[in-house]
From Swiss-Prot:
GO terms for cellular component: cytoplasm; presynaptic active zone
Higher taxonomy: Eukaryota, Metazoa, Chordata, Craniata, Vertebrata
Enzyme class: lyase
Protein name in UniProt: Glutamate decarboxylase 1
Annotated catalysed reactions: L-glutamate + H(+) = 4-aminobutanoate + CO2
Residues carrying N6-(pyridoxal phosphate)lysine: K405
Naturally occurring in which organism (per UniProt): Felis catus (Cat)
């Protein structure tokens, strides 16, 4: 057999390595151990035990020295248990004859529980390690019918009878195997990417606590964390630290819905009891490039999508203030009552920032509620270099800000911030007596759940709070600046190349870089309907080839009458210039013969 392929650590530093290669001949004990742990648990443990027994003293000495130099997270990936608490050493356990009923709180279930969770942690750590290894695929793509039919012992169907813990461990491993590694440095498909280790630890602890956010009574620490963090976010927006309110919601779409509910309640509080029949014909305004959640909220809240009026944008995707004012006047002339304007700070496709100052002037002139949807762009408020792009946000009545996007907090983590205290409570509270008793022994103003439209509410704050503690505001600033610099690097690399064409002129405001790849067959051909039709098919074909090969992922879409183009977004702090270079080369490789 030929000499062994480089280890994963070597290949990860080699930008030219084939991402589909597999290390077939590990040359050291620890790499063999990694292979063993990829086997079915019973077999893997036997192999690992054999390796430990047969390893030479010299090799063991080398390994112990090497392990001490590793980070603690990597220590956990090895099988060197000499320094661990004896209660948490892995033993050879036959999970094929164990079931969920054998775990805690079962009598004498502690040992089985420890061994099972150690196996789960091993699966998770192996996944984390591979996520940051560029020789690992971003995804192992299969069509829906293939996964539904079952893959090598991985079956999605539910059974009437319990399955063994061995099968459960296989299911855990294969669920990750057939998913998408959204934390991979070459995953650019969505606005939410990355795998922050501190955030991951926070999410694990959150699930272990398994509590609810509706009262201080059952989530005292988390409720206080949320209040402190929301106050800090409001201060960064530019509001007074004494006033204001906010809450974490399941996502930006719900945060935007909160803003419309708050605006409606502010001007027409009777709507809470009497409904939409008691108020005038209200209309909302948002840009034609804004997130679809504004129209969705209009439908859900009884305004109707016809009463969500779209404002024209310029070629960069920014609201044209003159068109906003003209449409407000037109609506008033038709007997409608303008209520609310949504300005976007970081549009989904172009990454555009609406001119908030000019929009705020119009809202003040006509007494309208101004909301800023900064779900994507809010993170730039953390950067002294880039926060000017949101100039005027302090004049807004409400702001949506998603830390799970640009700030890299694990999903889900979205905040709705409101400038005026008390509106969320007044709008949503129902005073359920079994939760929100007024005569508790503590200050019940900390029972924040009644200002939410939900009852049960997931703890989204801890991972974010923990990341902020670990990074500091400066750490988030550096992370965001780096992502913006990578977008500038990509733009500079492709803007003058004949095989690429920019969707709009000028440097990107955000990390969104929008471009067409022009295959050889379409270069030098004048614009025409036929050329646009052919170009429209290029991005989907390249994306399909990307997914089949699993090397990288980047999104595409049309916009208005424009043919499908690639929308590159960067929010993963693990990405580097070499990953941008790889993306460019991969698009060229996959698209050159189209």
């Amino acid at each position: 057999m030929a000499s062994s392929t480089p280890s994963s650590s070597a290949t990860s530093s080699n930008a030219g390595a084939d991402p589909n290669t597999t290390n077939l001949r590990p040359t050291t004990y620890d790499t063999w151990c990694g292979v063993a742990h990829g086997c079915t648990r019973k077999l893997g443990l036997k192999i690992c035990g054999f390796l430990q027994r047969t390893n030479s003293l010299e090799e063991k000495s080398r390994l112990v020295s090497a392990f001490k130099e590793r980070q603690s997270s990597k220590n956990l990936l090895s099988c060197e248990n000499s320094d661990r608490d004896g209660r948490f050493r892995r033993t050879e356990t036959d999970f094929s004859n164990l079931f969920a009923r054998d775990l805690l709180p079962a009598k004498n279930g502690e040992e089985q529980t420890v061994q099972f969770l150690l196996e789960v942690v091993d699966i998770l750590l192996n996944y984390v390690r591979k996520t940051f290894d560029r020789s690992t695929k971003v995804l192992d793509f299969h069509h829906p019918h293939q996964l539904l039919e079952g893959m090598e012992g991985f079956n999605l169907e539910l059974s009437d009878h319990p399955e063994s813990l061995e099968q459960i461990l296989v299911d855990c491993r294969d669920t990750l195997k057939y998913g998408v590694r959204t934390g991979h440095p070459r995953f650019f498909n969505q606005l939410s990417t990355g795998l922050d280790i501190i955030g991951l630890a926070g999410e694990w602890l959150t699930s272990t606590a398994n509590t609810n956010m509706f009262t201080y009574e059952i989530a005292p620490v988390f409720v206080l964390m949320e209040q402190i963090t929301l106050k800090k976010m409001r201060e960064i927006v530019g509001w007074s630290s004494k006033d204001g309110d906010g809450i974490f919601s399941p996502g930006g779409a719900i945060s935007n819905m909160y803003s419309i509910m708050a605006a409606r309640y502010k001007f027409f509080p009777e709507v809470k009891t009497k409904g939409m029949a008691a108020v005038p014909k209200l209309v909302l305004f948002t840009s034609e490039h804004s997130h679809y959640s504004i129209k969705k909220a209009g439908a859900a809240l009884g305004f109707g999508t016809d009463n969500v009026i779209l404002i024209k944008c310029n070629e960069r995707g920014k609201i044209i203030p003159a068109d906003l004012e003209a449409k407000i006047l037109e609506a008033k002339q038709k007997g409608y009552v303008p209520l609310y304007v949504n300005a976007t700070a970081g549009t989904t496709v172009y990454g555009a920032f609406d001119p908030i100052q000019e929009i705020a002037d119009i809202c003040e002139k006509y007494n309208l509620w101004l909301h800023v949807d900064a779900a994507w762009g809010g993170g730039l408020l953390m950067s002294r270099k880039h926060r000017h792009k949101l100039s005027g946000i302090e004049r807004a009545n409400s702001v949506t800000w998603n830390p799970h996007k640009m700030m890299g907090v694990l999903l889900q983590c979205s905040a709705i911030l409101v400038k005026e205290k008390g509106i969320l409570q007044g709008c949503n509270q129902m005073c359920a007596g079994y939760l929100f008793q007024p005569d508790k022994q503590y200050d019940v103003s900390y029972d924040t759940g009644d200002k939410a439209i939900q009852c049960g509410r997931h703890v989204d704050i801890f991972k974010f709070w923990l990341m902020w503690k670990a990074k500091g505001t400066v750490g988030f600033e550096n992370q965001i600046n780096k992502c913006l610099e990578l977008a500038e690097y990509l733009y500079a690399k492709i803007k003058n190349r004949e095989e690429f064409e920019m969707v709009f002129d000028g440097e990107p405001e955000h990390t969104n870089v929008c471009f067409w790849y022009i295959p050889q067959s379409l270069r030098g051909i004048p614009d025409s309907p036929e050329r646009r039709e052919k170009l429209h098919r290029v991005a989907p074909k390249i994306k399909a080839l990307m997914m089949e090969s699993g090397t990288t992922m980047v999104g595409y879409q049309p916009q208005g009458d424009k043919a499908n183009f690639f929308r590159m977004v960067i929010s993963n702090p693990a990405a580097t210039q070499s990953d941008i270079d790889f993306l460019i080369e991969e698009i060229e490789r996959l698209g050159q013969d189209l």
